[in-house]
Amino acid sequence: LDIHGPSILLRHQSDWISGWILQNWNYGEEGNNIKLGWDLSSSSWPEKFDSLYWSDSLPQIKRSGDMLGKIDISLARKLNLKEDLSIIAGTTDSNASFIAADIKEKDGLAVLGTTLVLKKRTHKPVQETGITNHRINNHWICGGASNAGCGILSRFFSNLELEELSKQINPKKSTNLKFIPLNSKGERFPINDSHLEPLVEPRPVSDALFLNGLLEGLANIELKGWK
């Protein structure tokens, strides 16, 4: 905003892509705009935003699954797509995985990517530090995202090394290494501590044992998250 001025549009990546397909960048999907300040409970931006000079840069929010419009005709012809193709508001990547897994009432979902994300269906929003709430098809989904995840694995091992070393691990035997496999300083979930330091030392001579310790550390974070 300081560089481009108040005429800039604040859009999440997926909202920008939807806007490009529509050739209309007015809209934003609610889940992707929580970090911008969108309040799911009241379905509104914070009142204080009204007085800010950049409030017009914010998108018009739509729920996941809402119709945004039809594809731009000239773009449809260029891409050889149907000219009446409907464009629907999507959701976040972790919410998409939750939907794809068809999670039931009492089940939860762990998504291990660059970071570790936990999701669970609830009857109402959960107001706790580090917990985010999303709404999908009139259901509430609460979740938390650790700063730890597969990012720490790729920092030390290649994909081929991970495949080979994993075969040497005995999952029934603990390493007792007590690693905290953060990629950098600071954690947000299951504990909120911006000063928490990674702990991945002392590194064992055995690479398989080291990998096992990192995986145990991730499993411990997941366990604390569910608790």
Task: For each feature predicted by the language model, list its residue ranges.
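Domain-core and long-helix interface of multi-subunit machines
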Residues: 63-66
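Helix-loop-beta segment of a Rossmann-like dinucleotide-binding subdomain
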Residues: 27-32
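Internal glycine-rich flexible loops
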Residues: 55
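Active-site core segments that coordinate phosphate-bearing ligands/cofactors
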Residues: 2-13, 18-24, 35-52, 69, ...
